[in-house]
Amino acid sequence: IGFRVCVHDDFAASASSIQLQNTKPHPHGMLSLWLDSANDFYRAPIDQAIAAVTARFHGYLVSESEPMPNTQYPPTKTGDRTYGMNQIVMLQIPDRMDHEQWLDIWRNSHTFVGIGTQSTFAYRQNRVIRAVTYAAPQYDAFIEENFPEESMFSDKHYYDDQADKAEKWDPLIDRYYPEAKTIRAKNPDAPRWQTNALIMQESVKRFIDIG
């Protein structure tokens, strides 16, 4: 069994003013497990162990893709807290879109925007195959994005303005989201981080309905 634990700890709570919470009650953590089988019989002992230490939990079988592994700040040993924060985004396909259209925009276009316009140092995409627990809320995907600590308190740090990252990711953004070039052209004097924020916000609108 492989695992990764993400909890809403005291450090994450210090940035509660900037958190967007569309899910109630707000989850206090996420446990990622890599199992030989997610079938009920083989998963039962794990579900029992989780139930023993939580008030409530929901489980999902997902297909994980990791376009940007954490090579910059990997934990030095099992049990160490990973540097910074892990932002979790729960996605639902808007009624205005079909599944294939939504998946194509998210994975084959927005991926480059999400990584290239932000100070992300790790990026994971989890497409939900099915819920594995009773009455689990309906989600279509989960995104996990790791950010440096400074990003929790500064838009400038959040929307990464490092030139070395731009050199790699800007060409990919322009190729798979051409509208980014138009946004830059309309804001020639804006600081890079502000332009990145505009590109990110416009790209998100394509496949996410912001409440």
Locations of regions flagged by a protein language model:
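Macromolecular interaction modules
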Residues: 1-211
